[in-house]
Amino acid sequence: MRLVTPGRLLALGAVLLAVAFALYVIPSNEYIFLPDKAHPVAPLVTVQGGHDPVHGGVYFVDVVVRKATILEKLFGGLHKGADLYPASAVNPPGVNDQQLRRIDLQDMSHSQQVAAAVALRAAGKHVVLRSIGAQIDEVAPGLPAVGKLEPDDVIVAINGKRVQSKNDVFTAMSSHKIGDTVSFTVRRGKQTFVERMRTVSSGGKSPHAIVGVVVETAVDIHLPLHVSIDAGGVGGPSAGLAFAIQVLAELEPDVLHGHKIAATGEIEPNGAVEPIGGVKQKTIGALIDEIAPGFPAVGKL
């Protein structure tokens, strides 16, 4: 029988500590969604001729998304309000984390432009705001669109049917089976051309036909006054509704009625609010700061 000496106990403790540390820092193959705090919007938005509301305020709520550590994957209850998702539910097919970050920042910039235009229109200002197609944000490596389509190209038709928004692309692609050949009419600068591509599988639990592009709605926007929005390093389009409400509140003082509200949701050029993701995390983030969540299931500004 071997004696358990202090030295052996110390060595065993060091090994267990090293294992625990490794489990805590080594990323797994899944992503974790965590609540984030509510962010005041007023310091981020400046409207020419506008004024911040004296009472109340608008806040946007975000979701912290990162690779889950092995420990977080094994014990999902380590963080309040956390959810785990496979990579296929977070990254578009063929898109890596660096590309996804770039897409998120582009989506944020786009959402700011649309939010300003929608809000000014709601305030009765003359605004030019038109959806003119689906702009390509990213082309995924190794998929059919490589060498044929490029970032900033605008898809204006699919199989001859006009495309005015990203949702038109999703609808058109959903009607095709994996392996179908699809015709894309594309505008690149002043040139318009047609590319035909055979679709491939997206993979994952719900495989569908793709060609390997990430798109957003292309818009033509002209505003009658200057609006500046600076979200720092926050990405994604879901702060659009909060930005729009803030712009409107700076021009129309009675919008908030003195309340503090947390708003989230991607806003479309027609004023519609897209379905909201991460509702659980965003609700927790708002309630932690004692701010009333104002998340429309379906809405329009």
Located regions from the model:
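Conserved PDZ fold ligand-binding element
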Residues: 145-168, 282-283, 290-301
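PDZ-domain C-terminal substructure recognizer with occasional recognition of PDZ-binding tails
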Residues: 170-214
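Short beta-alpha junctions and helix-cap segments that line functional grooves
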Residues: 46-49, 166-173, 183, 195-199, ...
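Glycine- and Gly-Pro-enriched alpha-helical subdomains that act as flexible
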Residues: 241, 245, 249-255, 261, ...
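PDZ/PDZ-like peptide-tail recognition elements
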Residues: 32-53, 59-65, 87-140, 196-254, ...
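Membrane-entry signal-anchor segments at the cytosolic-membrane interface
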Residues: 1-14, 102-106
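Hydrophobic membrane-insertion alpha-helices, especially the h-region
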Residues: 8-27
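Terminal peptide-recognition signature
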Residues: 120, 145, 152-155, 184, ...
